[in-house]
Amino acid sequence: MKDQLQALIEQAIDALRQDGTLPGDTAVDVQVTRTKDKAHGDFATNVALQLAKPARKKPRDVAEAIVARLPASGLVARTEIAGPGFINLFLGEQAKLSVIATIREQGERYGRSQLGAGKKVQVEFVSANPTGPLHVGHGRGAAYGAAVADLLEAVGFDVHREYYVNDAGRQMDILGTSVWLRYLELTGVELPFPTNAYRGDYVYDIAATLHREHGDHYKREAAEILDGLPPDEPDGGDKEEYIDAMIARAKELLGDNHYRFVFELGLNVILDDIRDDLAEFGVTYDTWYSERSLTDKGAVNLAIERLREAGHLYEKDGALWFRSTDFGDEKDRVVQRDNGQTTYFASDIAYHMDKMERGYDRVIDVWGADHHGYVPRVKAALKALGEDETRLDVLLVQFAILYRGGERVQMSTRSGSFVTLRELREEVGKDAARFFYVMRRCEQHLDFDLDLAKSQSADNPVYYIQYAHARVCSVLRQMEAKGLKHDPSHGEAKLSLLTESHEQEILATLARFPEVIEAAALVEEPHQIANYLRELANDFHTYYNAHQFLVDEPAIRDARLSLILAVRQVIANGLGLLGVSAPQEM
């Protein structure tokens, strides 16, 4: 509807250009917005104020000229010029009512558009290190990233969903070594477990699999393992130095092939679990992109070489540094250590270079808020490589903090005492988790109230919205039980009987849905959909409590049923964009 109004105004402006009222080269971006006060119409535009200066006319005179040249349409019943030159547009009754037929005809497609048609967008999200199960912190990034991808797809973008698998580097070595040390315990070798190793039960489980399938094949004695190692933190040493020494010892004693086998076992078990976990959460990907593949195909060295050739690298203290300060970063960054090993940042440069070369119009990274300092260096690298860094949009997601019984739930990944995403789903359900995660702006901290998420009350937003959908389904079951039938054509022909204020509010809210989707998609804010659904559910529940639907008069009955069926469809469409189901019974 908004697009149709903009088209009418653009036609009027074109006519004024042709007759000389407006200069022929006048360019203007016609914006039509919904009014907050219905006394000022349904929509308004300030286009006359924008055109007044280039036309050298008073804004009200321009507004009057535009109104006079508006094409005849059943869409606009009347216009009104307000203030310095605002044009208020009052919709015709049939235009307001036509949304019901549109919703019925379009069904699941209602609200979708082709705004982004022809443009490719990549959304990379979650990308948690495969060093353990996903925890509740990862859950918010998963729900948010999936919803952003679905919103962009809903407005016509060609969306590619990607998970970057950090299957190389120190954290993976810590995991592999942790698995081996737990395995040694199962073979009877007594060793102090490193302070900085991974301690979760899942490490025991992987170690048990290794022992069950391979017996003592990877067993080494404590004396040769501990010989010459520096002290760990409890003994006055440095925990980072100790775990690095233990990793080196594991590689030395096991040899490349055996160490790689243990490493791969840990990686694959956890990665399979992450895939299953996300699939159960309703989150799927087009590509699982391996960090290690970048090194294997020489992409990391190529990125470094391109930076070197462009004169953006220098050597200091035996390491290779990127002059990222030349491109707005707060300090220069190491891309290759003094031991010849490339850094995680170097892999990230190669990965983002690869993304740009794949031809996406936009690249969206969804990162945890703790990575905020990482954004300038990645953009600096892209700029140094001659890429358009504005194509990269990094969305930072704040942590979700769980509360149970009013008390904050503590979590820590390496110690193993964390709440997993799977445990959260088991406690509150997938739907509540998906909805609660996206009902605030991503940059806002989220206090996740577990008790509220499980409650069956109007205070629980996802329950309140789903209950509205289920209530409509219940009305339809009652209709069938009474032997009644709904005639959609008859109902839509009698919508003019819906004169109650509740009915008018619902009609207006339903008509806004496509605009809400476009607005939410363009600024990557799924919470706008959540807020809209809460508003629509509230409108419906108020209506439900005030009126009967299965009345004796067929015309009113069919009209009201057509209205609430439209509500049901829009709620289902909106919940679907957030990865939430629309149950028929509750």
UniProtKB/Swiss-Prot annotation:
<keyword id="KW-0648">Protein biosynthesis</keyword>
<dbReference type="InterPro" id="IPR001412">
    <property type="entry name" value="aa-tRNA-synth_I_CS"/>
</dbReference>
<dbReference type="InterPro" id="IPR001278">
    <property type="entry name" value="Arg-tRNA-ligase"/>
</dbReference>
<dbReference type="GO" id="GO:0005524">
    <property type="term" value="F:ATP binding"/>
</dbReference>
<dbReference type="GO" id="GO:0004814">
    <property type="term" value="F:arginine-tRNA ligase activity"/>
</dbReference>
<dbReference type="Pfam" id="PF03485">
    <property type="entry name" value="Arg_tRNA_synt_N"/>
</dbReference>
<comment type="subunit">
    <text>Monomer.</text>
</comment>
<feature type="short sequence motif" description="'HIGH' region">
    <location>
        <begin position="128"/>
        <end position="138"/>
    </location>
</feature>
<dbReference type="InterPro" id="IPR005148">
    <property type="entry name" value="Arg-tRNA-synth_N"/>
</dbReference>
<comment type="similarity">
    <text>Belongs to the class-I aminoacyl-tRNA synthetase family.</text>
</comment>
<dbReference type="InterPro" id="IPR008909">
    <property type="entry name" value="DALR_anticod-bd"/>
</dbReference>
<dbReference type="InterPro" id="IPR035684">
    <property type="entry name" value="ArgRS_core"/>
</dbReference>
<protein>
    <recommendedName>
        <fullName>Arginine--tRNA ligase</fullName>
        <ecNumber>6.1.1.19</ecNumber>
    </recommendedName>
</protein>
<dbReference type="GO" id="GO:0005737">
    <property type="term" value="C:cytoplasm"/>
</dbReference>
<keyword id="KW-0547">Nucleotide-binding</keyword>
<keyword id="KW-0963">Cytoplasm</keyword>
<keyword id="KW-0067">ATP-binding</keyword>
<dbReference type="InterPro" id="IPR009080">
    <property type="entry name" value="tRNAsynth_Ia_anticodon-bd"/>
</dbReference>
<keyword id="KW-0030">Aminoacyl-tRNA synthetase</keyword>
<dbReference type="InterPro" id="IPR036695">
    <property type="entry name" value="Arg-tRNA-synth_N_sf"/>
</dbReference>
<dbReference type="GO" id="GO:0006420">
    <property type="term" value="P:arginyl-tRNA aminoacylation"/>
</dbReference>
<dbReference type="Pfam" id="PF05746">
    <property type="entry name" value="DALR_1"/>
</dbReference>
<dbReference type="Pfam" id="PF00750">
    <property type="entry name" value="tRNA-synt_1d"/>
</dbReference>
<keyword id="KW-0436">Ligase</keyword>
<dbReference type="InterPro" id="IPR014729">
    <property type="entry name" value="Rossmann-like_a/b/a_fold"/>
</dbReference>
